[in-house]
Amino acid sequence: SSTETPPSYNQLNYNENLLRFFNSKPVTAPVELDPPKVEPSYVSSAREDARSTLSPVQGFEGSGGTGSSGNFTTGSNLHMSSVTNTSNAGTGTSGTGNSGGGGGGGGGAGPGNGAVPPVTLTESLLNKHNDEMEKFMLKKHRESRGRSGEKNKKSANDTLKMVEYSGPGPGPGHGHGIKRGGSHSWEGEANKPKQLLTLNTGGMPPLLDIHTSSASLSKCQASGAGGGGSGSVGGTGNIGSGGSNAQPSTNQYTQSGLSCTQNINLWPPFSVGITTPTSVLSTHTAVAQSSFSTQHNLFPTFYYIPASIAASSPSGTSPNPRPHKHTLVHKSAEQPSTSQAAAATMPLQYMTGLMYPHPSLFYTHPAAAAATAMV
């Protein structure tokens, strides 16, 4: 910023001074401890000059021009190579590491690095050079600070963009702040029936009572035929007629149960026109099939009582209401296992004296069905 104090020239030049010092290969150990090295001739001559009492200018010439002295940087060697040879103002260090003791305005002893003719140094020329180099270093300092500031700003903007676009959705910021778990395939397959199951049961009209179960079964049978099912549909009047023709109604109930459960797989998952318990059963079957496909062939035993069990009951009593009662209660017992809200909205209750296997969602053993039918 413009209000902060700019660094001094010595602070700006500190790193380059260190670089020049170590590039000049200063002597940091006694000669006896130095390991024998194969060195170029100019490096060895530079070390000899550093240990001798020669002037800094001669030492610099002997070292082959590996370093400059005073407050001048290596950039000055490009323009004023001969000036840097004798630019000791009494405060700097020579190229070989010895402190300069010469005067500031001494003339050049000879060409430094090339055939450029020596320039006579004056105090004004040195001051001008110092000012130019200070401006150059300040400019470089500002550029480095500007680059770092731009880099920090860019990284902050990238972070904001990542947070903004992290939400799963087509547009930017869609779903920002909403935690969503699971992949899209899981949400599309098995989560949708569960979510819409609770919606269906919540917005469903009250279920029919036990004594009106024959009407609901006839509706199931009619809808099974309308959905392109394989079951026979002629017995709607027989089921609704009561207990006078008990055995045909039981057989047709068996067929209607088969047609209902088989046609559930052919319907769309959520049919709008159906508000009977068959819609709930269809969602239940869809969830079951998407989760446990290995027990697909066992589903029909889940929804009907076999005709042999119904025929083995005493002929004096009409077995028509009993299978309906058991089956409807069995349906109501299966639904709360997937959703407690479904059990809260149903007027049907569990029957006393019966044992309901709670986690058995997909298969009821025939022996268990026979035991519950005999109660």
Curated annotation (Swiss-Prot):
Keyword Phosphoprotein in the entry? The reply is yes
Give me the stretches of Gly residues compositional bias. 92-113, 224-243
Q: Where is the composition biased (Low complexity)?
A: 69-91
UniProt protein name = Period circadian protein
A single Gene Ontology CC term: nucleus
Q: Name one GO biological process term.
A: entrainment of circadian clock by photoperiod
Q: Name one GO molecular function term.
A: transcription cis-regulatory region binding
Q: Which organism is it from?
A: Drosophila sucinea (Fruit fly)
Where on the tree of life does the source sit, at the highest rank?
Answer: Eukaryota
The record describes its quaternary structure and partners as: Forms a heterodimer with timeless (TIM); the complex then translocates into the nucleus.
